[in-house]
Amino acid sequence: VPVNVLKRSVLRQLKNKRTEIANSAGLGADCAVFAPFSKGQMVTCVQEGVVELQCENDLAEAEREDLSVMPMRRIFQKCANNLAAAGAEPVAAELVIFLPETVEEPELKALMEEAEKAATDLNIQIIGGQTRVSSAVRQPIATATGYGILSEAAVTQASAGKKLAGQDIIITKWIGLEGTADLAARNREKLLERYPAYLVEEAAAFDRYYSILPEAATAVKSGGCTMHDIS
């Protein structure tokens, strides 16, 4: 994208800061710099998705069936969940967005505002990335690379943890939570023909339970030997 668009609609939307980051990438600076830390380890993960430019219930029929289409906030939540499942505290993310030629600047700005809100809610600093326009894509595609810090205690615990007979398998919240929320949000009108509105809206609102960060932190403190985010 042009430099003025990059400044106005991308970089200016990034406000959340963390002490673990010495410098973010930006104009003329292609690399972010992490502040030195003496204990623990760096953990990283990647989450991708086709990004919605409109609200979920306005999706085209084909998009309703494609679960790779998701709001920007979901990409960040999945990234944070994966880091937390590794026992790490999410601290930073890089965001790459490929845009179709039909996308206007206000839509890009809205995507970045949504990304920044999602990152801020998770206390993640967006430290860099790329924003490109390409005739090869039909819808915005986003990839977030997340970075987390695994504390020294968590490193020791993970290396000592063993899966043994007699251990408990603990599942938090509910199986099918994400799928239920997706189906309800993408098919509101169809579901309202058969079910009461309160039931459909409650199901669609299950997205408020997506975060596993509190449970993951508890598992680390409690000596869990392994974790996995099944979303």
Predicted regions and their residues:
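Helix-biased detector of long, well-ordered alpha-helical tracts
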Residues: 1-231
